[in-house]
């Protein structure tokens, strides 16, 4: 049963832990005087001569829930208090495929400096992402039982997907102004994996006989994982050898990634930008295992690869109620039908959660900018689109005020705000992609907060001045 508990732990991590995603939409992405905007587009032009931060530079924490909502499962009185639990209403509100995602990015160290050849950056970040997907049939079965699947809905067809990943990222970036209109950017990433888990398949079919009400259960499960602890296989079971984490093992889970970006200023009012982030892979070599699930022939309930339950006799029911040892023995017998076999594997490769960003903007004047952006982002369960409209107010080359509105599948109430201020070289910022999430989190799709402190140095450098410096450097060579 230990390997089953390990699988359950991995699933629980996907539901409860924090995690980081490939770049999510944030008001910080639209700031003009905050070098953190480089995270969204490596071609972003920063007027700062240099910046650095240690541990306090950036935290991005959030939850995305496209599925279960508190207010969908209750009826409320005139005072707004829940009075009746309405499971049918809650199930009807669900999509065919639902998601629960959590993420966290922690910037450990960042720095950047302008030279005569361009702008160079370095960053060290810890990133983590967990994503759980589930279909409506899972909640419907839990809420209404198997009776809800008689007739044309037979069988209950349950699909669950889990994706969990944690790694460190070391990134070297370069941004260059080709002309006063063209900016390009490149960021190379070296990755060190901590842990990974993903379901290649997790399906349960529960068929109810319309006449006898006998239950027929068929399962398919395949989970690949890389664990942070050393383990050995003994008698077909996985045993953790040492629960102490060894940092040297990080070098065995290695990867490479790249971010590409560009910006073109059409005229004094209009501009466009695009970026492709997190294009790459991680090779998981350390403590890798593959779990394969199937129905075992454990006795009379087994039938051609399925578990068939026709009920208990009156004597068995009475024995369960009267004899604790009999009940324990029966449960052990039933669990013998369900097997998750761990298989030691040499390793496997996973791609990063790549995302594409395309943006257009209009500068009313030097202070006010209006933007429209499309982003296709990946949470480990496929590419999802997000469309964002944004306003940026930038003042005195020190302050940014940003308001965003983002639409994505199943979520249309995302109003974000962001503030950034530079006080004599001390830059502080705070932002959220959905201010409503703080007032009613149980009923919101997104809950997010992003904040940090950096130190900037040197005089501000305009694009025109940068071009002159780069041209002079080229002539000198």
Regions inferred by a protein language model and the residue ranges of each:
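Residues on the lipid-exposed face of transmembrane beta-strands in outer-membrane beta-barrel proteins
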Residues: 42-44, 104-113, 122, 170-178, ...
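Transmembrane beta-strands of outer-membrane beta-barrel pores
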Residues: 58-62, 126-130, 190-194, 276-283, ...
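Outer-membrane beta-barrel channels and translocator barrels
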Residues: 47, 115-118, 179-181, 267, ...
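Residues that define the transmembrane beta-barrel architecture of outer-membrane proteins
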Residues: 36-38, 102-107, 164-170, 254-258, ...
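Solvent-exposed loop/turn segments connecting transmembrane beta-strands
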Residues: 31-36, 350-354, 365-369, 373-388, ...
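N-terminal, post-signal peptide beta-strand-biased segments of exported outer-membrane/organellar beta-barrel
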Residues: 19-128, 132, 196
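Transmembrane beta-strands of outer-membrane beta-barrel proteins
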Residues: 52-55, 120-122, 184-188, 272-275, ...
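Outer-membrane beta-barrel translocator/channel fold
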Residues: 68, 96-100, 133-166, 226-232, ...
């Amino acid at each position: 049963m230990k390997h089953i508990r390990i699988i359950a732990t991995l699933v629980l991590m996907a539901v409860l832990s924090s995690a980081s995603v490939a770049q999510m939409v944030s008001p910080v992405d639209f700031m003009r005087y905050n070098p953190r905007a480089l995270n969204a587009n490596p071609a972003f032009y920063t007027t700062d001569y240099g910046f650095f931060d240690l541990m306090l530079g950036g935290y991005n924490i959030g939850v995305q829930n496209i599925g279960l909502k508190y207010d969908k499962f209750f009826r409320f009185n005139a005072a707004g208090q829940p009075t009746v639990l309405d499971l049918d209403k809650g199930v009807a509100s669900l999509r065919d495929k639902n998601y629960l995602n959590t993420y966290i990015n922690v910037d450990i160290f960042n720095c950047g400096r302008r030279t005569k050849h361009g702008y160079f950056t370095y960053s060290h970040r810890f990133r983590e992402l967990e994503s759980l997907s589930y279909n409506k049939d899972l909640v419907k079965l839990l809420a209404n039982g198997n009776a809800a699947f008689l007739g044309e809905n037979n069988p209950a067809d349950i699909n669950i997907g889990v994706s969990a990943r944690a790694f460190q990222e070391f990134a070297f970036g370069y941004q260059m102004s080709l002309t006063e209109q063209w900016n390009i950017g490149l960021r190379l990433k070296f990755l060190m994996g901590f842990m990974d888990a993903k379901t290649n398949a997790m399906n349960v079919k529960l068929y109810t006989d319309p006449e006898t009400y006998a239950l027929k259960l068929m399962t398919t499960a395949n989970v690949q994982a890389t664990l942070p602890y050393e383990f050995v296989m003994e008698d077909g079971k996985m045993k953790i050898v040492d629960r102490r984490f060894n940092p040297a093992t990080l070098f065995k889970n290695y990867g490479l990634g790249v971010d590409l970006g560009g910006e073109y200023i059409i005229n004094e009012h209009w501009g466009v930008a695009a970026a492709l982030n997190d294009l790459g892979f991680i090779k998981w070599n350390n403590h890798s295992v593959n779990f394969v699930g199937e129905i075992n022939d454990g006795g009379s309930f087994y039938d051609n690869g399925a578990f068939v339950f026709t009920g208990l006799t009156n004597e068995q029911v009475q024995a369960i109620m009267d004899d604790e040892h009999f009940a324990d023995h029966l449960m052990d017998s039933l669990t013998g039908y369900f097997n998750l076999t761990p298989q030691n594997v040499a390793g496997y490769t996973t791609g990063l959660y790549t995302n594409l960003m395309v943006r257009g903007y209009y500068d009313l004047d030097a202070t006010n900018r209006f933007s429209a952006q499309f982003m296709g982002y990946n949470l480990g369960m496929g590419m999802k689109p997000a469309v964002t409209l944004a306003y940026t107010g930038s003042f005195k080359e020190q302050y940014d005020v940003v308001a965003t509105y983002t639409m994505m599948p199943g979520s249309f109430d995302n109003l974000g705000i962001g503030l950034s201020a530079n006080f004599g070289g001390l830059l502080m910022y705070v932002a959220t992609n959905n201010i409503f999430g703080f007032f009613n989190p149980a009923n919101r799709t997104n809950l997010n907060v992003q904040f940090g402190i950096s130190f900037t140095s040197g005089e501000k450098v305009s694009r025109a001045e940068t071009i002159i410096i780069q041209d002079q450097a080229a002539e000198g060579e």
